[in-house]
Design a protein with these regions (language model features):
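N-terminal, positively charged/glycine-rich alpha-helical extensions of SAM-dependent methyltransferases
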Residues: 2-42
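Conserved SAM-binding loop and adjacent beta-strand
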Residues: 43-58
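Conserved class I S-adenosyl-L-methionine
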Residues: 69-78
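Class I SAM-dependent methyltransferase SAM/SAH-binding core
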Residues: 79-123
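A short acidic, Gly/Pro-enriched loop at the edge of an enzyme's catalytic core
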Residues: 126-134
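A short SAM/SAH-binding and catalytic strip from SAM-dependent methyltransferases
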Residues: 133-146
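A short glycine-rich, Lys/Arg-flanked "PGG" loop and its adjoining helix->strand segment in the class I
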Residues: 149-159
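Conserved beta-strand signature within the Rossmann-like core of class I S-adenosyl-L-methionine
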Residues: 160-168
Length: 211
């Protein structure tokens, strides 16, 4: 697949392979085996660094202001970086799901009464629990039909709950945001950039009243 110069520029300043992956179409998402291999090494270790702090801070800020101390479902939690950012603010319950068993193995020691991690395919995951906050942190663009995924997860959202979506800025993200518009209304949105001028849009969303 040929990437346009503008998309290449978006990848500058951060690990190249890690930045190019989300720019591909969802159907080119690596299979489970590749994700397991990557989590077995240090491929995603940069996510815990300063270059990623801006969008994590916005996500945590929305949580702390809109649903402080609530229950959280983190879809595509990886190695639990977001959980470590949320924990100092407190939560009633946190569940992180990821289909890479290698990622979940790395956070086994963090499980406690309020914190759990589960190996699960987000497209088939189900629960009888309702969450105050559902977070898609750099995970939504990996799905073939992001809007269908969000619509499904709205069924797991508490009545006054909030969906928080963070996506690195790229041309093909516009279509995803537009596809979400009939399902959710924007409570607030923030765009942030790091020193390498890589940017993220983070939105706090609520289910539309008519749904």
């Amino acid at each position: 697949m040929k990437l346009s110069p503008s998309l290449i520029m978006l990848a500058q300043g951060l690990p190249l392979a890690a930045r190019l992956l989300p720019l591909f179409a969802a159907e080119e998402t690596p299979p489970r085996a590749r994700w397991e291999h990557e989590y077995g090494g240090d491929r995603w270790s940069y996510l815990a660094g300063l270059d990623e702090a801006a969008h994590y801070s916005v996500i945590v800020g929305y949580y702390a202001l809109l649903q402080p101390g609530g229950s959280v479902l983190d879809v595509g939690c990886g190695e639990g970086i977001l959980q470590s950012r949320l924990a100092p603010h407190g939560y009633r319950r946190y569940l992180g799901i990821d289909f890479a068993a290698g990622a979940i193995e790395r956070v086994e020691a963090r499980r406690d009464r309020a914190t759990d991690f589960q190996v699960a395919d987000a497209t088939s995951f189900t629960t009888d629990q309702a969450f105050d906050v559902i977070i898609f942190n750099e995970s939504l663009y990996y799905f073939c039909d992001p809007a269908a995924v969000v619509e499904r997860y709205l069924g797991f959202l508490a009545g006054d709950g909030v969906v928080i979506v963070s996506m690195v800025i790229a041309r093909n993200r516009i279509a995803i945001w537009n596809a979400l518009a009939p399902l959710v209304e924007t409570v607030d949105e923030t765009t942030v950039f790091n020193r390498a001028r890589v940017g993220w849009t983070v939105k706090a969303l609520r289910r539309r009243a008519e749904l």
